[in-house]
Amino acid sequence: MVRYMRYIATFGYHTNHIFDKNGKIIGIDDEKISNMILIYSLDVDADENTVNSIKNTKNYIESKLKEYNIPYLFVEVNPYEFNTNVKNFRKYIVPKTIINLTGGKRIVGYALFYAAVLEKENVEKVFYVSKLGDIIEFPLIPPDIKLTELEMKILNLLDKEGEMSVSNIAHKLERSLSTISEYVSQLEKKGLVKKLSKGRRKIVKKVI
C-alpha cells in the first residue's frame, strides 16, 4: 500500500487520542500515513512535572512511530501567538492531510482548525476523539460563506428529504441534471454537502 497522507495531531499529557488501546493510530490506517507532525506547547512558567509529562508523551509517540516506520516531526509552539501559529500551521497542511485536534491546549487546536479552514482544499478531514474513542468529524465551513438561491434550494430540499441522488434533486427542483451536478459540486467545495457512491448512484447528503 502506498503511503500518501500526512497526519497532524496536537498533544499534551497523554496519547490516548492518537493511539488506541492496541497501539494503533486513531482515525486512519497507519499504512496510509506518509509522515506525521506532532504539535505541542509549554508555558514559559511550566513546572518540572509538566515538562517531564510532555517529555514522556513525546518519548512514547516517538517509540510508536519508529515501530511503524513513519517519519515524524515534533513542533513546539507558543500557545498564545495565535496568528503566527495559524500562519505556520498552514504551511504544514499539504494535499491529503488529516488533522486530529484532540490533545494539548485548546487555543493551539483553535489555531490549527482555523488554518485547516483556510487550507480546506488540502484537508481530507479534521476530527476530535471523545473519551469513549468516538471520532467526531468537523466540517470546514468558512465564516464568510455565501450561497446562491439554487444552492439554498438544494440545502433546504436535503433538510426535508435527507440523502438524495443528484438526479432526484434535479427532478424535484425541475432543473437539468448538469446544472444540479454543477451546484452540488460547488456546495461540496464549500464543505456543506458530501457525495457518496451507492452502487452506480451518487448520493448527496448535508454535512451539518
From Swiss-Prot:
Signal peptide: none
Gene3D superfamilies: 3.40.50.11700, Winged helix-like DNA-binding domain superfamily/Winged helix DNA-binding domain
Gene Ontology molecular function: DNA binding
Listed InterPro entries: Csa3, WH-like_DNA-bd_sf, WH_DNA-bd_sf
Pfam families per record: HTH_24
Keywords associated with the record: Antiviral defense, DNA-binding
Keyword DNA-binding (UniProt): yes
GO BP: defense response to virus
Domain of life of the native organism: Archaea
Family annotation (CDD domains): CasRa_I-A
Reported function: CRISPR (clustered regularly interspaced short palindromic repeat) is an adaptive immune system that provides protection against mobile genetic elements (viruses, transposable elements and conjugative plasmids). CRISPR clusters contain spacers, sequences complementary to antecedent mobile elements, and target invading nucleic acids. CRISPR clusters are transcribed and processed into CRISPR RNA (crRNA).
Recorded family membership: Belongs to the CRISPR-associated Csa3 family.
Protein name: CRISPR locus-related putative DNA-binding protein Csa3
Organism, as annotated: Methanocaldococcus jannaschii (strain ATCC 43067 / DSM 2661 / JAL-1 / JCM 10045 / NBRC 100440)
